[in-house]
A protein has these predicted regions:
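Repeat-unit-sized solenoid/scaffold elements
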Residues: 1-2, 79, 89-106, 129-143, ...
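Solvent-exposed edge beta-strands and adjacent loop segments
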Residues: 1-73, 118-134
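Short secondary-structure transition/capping segments
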Residues: 8-11, 109-111, 143-149
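Compositionally biased amphipathic helical and low-complexity segments enriched in hydrophobic
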Residues: 11-15, 82, 141, 172
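Acidic surface patches and DE-rich sequence motifs
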Residues: 15, 105, 147
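Short amphipathic beta-strand/extended segments with alternating polar/hydrophobic composition
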Residues: 21-26, 111-117, 154-158
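Structured, beta-strand-rich domain cores
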Residues: 56-114
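Mixed-charge, glycine-accented linear interaction segment located at domain edges/termini
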Residues: 117-178
Length: 178
């Protein structure tokens, strides 16, 4: 089925027993892409390939946001936000989070959720206003790694967007919707 769009990206802080707290809506997303970290190894014997092992050990995640929100940076990257001032410190440690979004695949809404992600600092890209308006986006890059049980991503299909949204909210601990 053809994919048609992506929306409603959320995250929650990964806590004890692989549960999530402090869930938040990220921002409108222009892109939400995961590239699996794959490994393929071949074993040879008797002058031929006798076995192939394919493994996936997580994914590189790229989330393109249309909004630049200091509170989101503080939570995702471990920075300190006080009275509207975001302080970046070399000792800051980003927490592990779970993050997901909803896309339309054919006639079904598909919730995608990466279970354990560590985001890194986005590039600080700025440009001057020109003759025509251009919009700039922020791209957060992260690494999704497996939990102790080996799982690193889940997907679930729904008949409605609202059902998929309720599912993601439940995963990350969002009790009121934006």
């Amino acid at each position: 089925m053809a994919k048609k769009g992506i929306r409603y990206a959320v995250f929650g802080l990964l806590g004890a027993n692989n549960t999530y707290t402090g869930g938040k809506y990220l921002a409108p997303v222009a892109a939400f892409n995961g590239t699996p970290n794959k490994s393929s190894v071949k074993d040879y014997g008797d002058d031929r390939c006798v076995e192939v092992s394919n493994e996936t050990m997580g994914a590189a995640l790229s989330v393109e946001l249309t909004n630049d929100d200091l509170e989101i940076y503080a939570m995702l990257l471990g920075h300190t936000l006080t009275e509207g001032e975001l302080v970046y410190n070399t000792d800051d440690e980003a927490p592990y989070v779970g993050t997901g979004a909803i896309g339309l695949s054919g006639k079904k809404w598909r919730a995608k959720f990466y279970k354990k992600v560590l985001f890194s600092e986005p590039n600080d890209e700025n440009s001057t206003k020109q003759e025509s308006t251009t919009f700039g986006h922020i791209t957060l890059e992260g690494e999704a790694v497996p939990l102790e049980d080996g799982s690193w991503k889940i997907e679930k299909e729904f008949d409605t967007f609202d059902a998929a949204k309720t599912y993601l909210n439940g995963l990350v601990g969002i009790t009121t919707t934006p």
